[in-house]
Amino acid sequence: MFYDMVRGWFKKSAGNYNAFVKALLINDVEAMNEYMNVISEEIFSNFDVGTKPSKLQPERLVSCYDCNGVANGSSLNDSSNLYAMTRKSSRFYHGFVLGLMVDKRDDYIIKSNKESGFGRYDVMMIPRDTENSNLPGLILEFKVINHSMEKSLEETVKSALQQIEEKKYDTELLKAGVKKENIRHYGFAFEGKKVLIGTDE
């Protein structure tokens, strides 16, 4: 459901939903940031409270944690609820990025909100063929800025990357046969419409 909605949004715009995935796989962090900020601005411009009717039907948006096409969580009934939620949690961005990622289901096992190491990662992408493929194993962690603890999005990205390391989220990828040197970590930090993506490489 969420996958279909994401694709539907891009049909109405000039955006290419594959561009982000391509940038991710070649580790082009600059392109990832540019893409996500353009899309974030476009999406949230349509949800500004009291400005104009939403083109994106916010009542259909749900939190998505199942890449097999099953969307879970409560639907959002108005734009103010959506905007408030995205300021307080990373669930919307989590679901949105998952909607982009599932296009790679043939190459990756895509998991979300599962246990690995000493905690639960947000998104993990495990190459289906770990022996004959050069595809990297990927871990994505999402955080909304906590102004009581962080002064900038850069600090939020750092916090996300530290969590990946401290909680040993690599454990599942390593058990699946992905080599340590072929694992990448990405921290996603959010503040309103602003997005910052960073890596520990």
Specify the residue positions occupied by each region the protein language model found:
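Extended alpha-helical interface modules used as scaffolds for assembling large macromolecular complexes
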Residues: 1-168, 195-201
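Domain-level recognition of nuclease-like catalytic cores that cleave nucleotide substrates
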Residues: 172-201
